[in-house]
Amino acid sequence: MKALILVGGYGTRLRPLTLTQPKPLVEFANKPMMLHQMEALAAVGVDTVVLAVSYRAEQLEAEMTVHADRLGVKLIFSLEEEPLGTAGPLALARKHLEDDDPFFVLNSDVICDFPFKQMVEFHKQHGKEGTIAVTKVEEPSKYGVVVFKEDGKIDDFVEKPQEYVGNKINAGLYIFNSAILDRIPLKPTSIEKEIFPQMATSGNLYAYVLPGFWMDVGQPKDFLKGMSLFLNHVQTTRTGALATGSNIHGTATIRGSVLVDPSATVGENCVIGPDVVIGPRVQIEGGVRIQHSTILSDSTVGNYSWVSGSIIGRECHIGSWVRMENVCVLGDDVVVKDEVYLNEASVLPHKVIAVNVPSKDIIM
């Protein structure tokens, strides 16, 4: 089988993390976000992945080719000269997708359990042109709702309904037969607004209800929530602790779901967790408290600092007695001096912060 991943554009909602790398390469639970998808695709026999790319294509190719070779997956890069929406990239990559097999299409910023095997079985069972994965949400009035019958046949799409019509939304994971390519022109086209309604009207589109967790990692708060859902899922489905290794000091306390890369070090009397990811070669010095946060690769957190609900980019240095909270996001190579307080601060890469940021601000 083949798959096409819609890589998208600049990832502006996840800045400053995406100012130095494309969004699919941002580390999520110590792997590039896209690698979670590629590993799940390879596990169900996908041998060719087409990446519909536009922003920092060379950087994406350099890193993902290494992972694809390890997985035994052929990567094809389909470069958009101009934005083509969510359907146009399929037309652009048509020559790579035209065969008898159904193929996957994924939004690159979706994190879930990726039940691709079950999706394929469901798609073959109903025998129609397309399958959309849908997921349950608590506040359907904020989204476009998918209305479908008990057997999955989609009747309608209702955008931000004022009255209750259902609580399932498009989860950004699809399976299509190659016949869909005849519906899509090579121009900017929305698959959700222009192609799916056509398919539903002709009875060719079905909904597969995702089990388990799901998150569209759009903004930093979504990143952190998705990380929590992911860690709790892994904790309940995997035997053994997530945070293990000789580099965690014996006096350190691990609380709840915590993922520590084996190459990272955690100092004495630290309290780590819940919902924390510590990346490769990260150094956490003594007495540090971290919760609901992720520390990306090659960063350092100094003695007795407090980090809560925050994302620290790659190669950052956090001084001693620093306090960061309320969705602080540091780009790569940021230095925070000792005893600085950051509250809901977004700091662009390569900055040095020596004064407090007591309220929401962007440090350029």
Swiss-Prot record:
Pathway: Nucleotide-sugar biosynthesis; GDP-alpha-D-mannose biosynthesis; GDP-alpha-D-mannose from alpha-D-mannose 1-phosphate (GTP route): step 1/1
Cofactor binding note of this UniProt entry: Coordinates binding with substrate and required for enzymatic activity.
GO cellular component: cytoplasm
Heme found in the keyword field: no
Taxonomic superkingdom: Eukaryota
Record text on activity regulation: Enzyme activity is reduced by incorporation into the GMPPA-GMPPB mannose-1-phosphate guanylyltransferase complex. Allosterically inhibited, when part of the GMPPA-GMPPB complex, by GDP-alpha-D-mannose binding to GMPPA.
Signal peptide extent: none
Catalytic site: 160
Region described as Hexapeptide repeat domain: 243-364
The enzyme's E.C. designation: 2.7.7.13
Gene3D superfamilies the record matches: Hexapeptide repeat proteins, Spore Coat Polysaccharide Biosynthesis Protein SpsA, Chain A
Positions annotated to bind GDP-alpha-D-mannose: 109, 216
PROSITE patterns linked: HEXAPEP_TRANSFERASES (PS00101)
Subunit structure of this chain's protein: Component of the GMPPA-GMPPB mannose-1-phosphate guanylyltransferase complex composed of 4 GMPPA subunits and 8 tag-335/GMPPB subunits; the complex is organized into three layers, a central layer made up of 2 GMPPA dimers sandwiched between two layers each made up of 2 tag-335/GMPPB dimers. Catalytic activity of tag-335/GMPPB is reduced when part of the complex and binding of GDP-alpha-D-Mannose by GMPPA induces allosteric feedback inhibition of tag-335/GMPPB.
Domain notes: The N-terminal substrate-binding domain adopts a Rossman-like fold and has a binding pocket for GTP or GDP-alpha-D-mannose. Substrate binding is coordinated by an Mg(2+) ion. The C-terminal domain consists of a series of tandem hexapeptide repeats that adopt a beta-helix conformation. The beta-helix forms several protein interaction surfaces involved in assembly of the GMPPA-GMPPB mannose-1-phosphate guanylyltransferase complex.
Protein name: Mannose-1-phosphate guanylyltransferase catalytic subunit beta
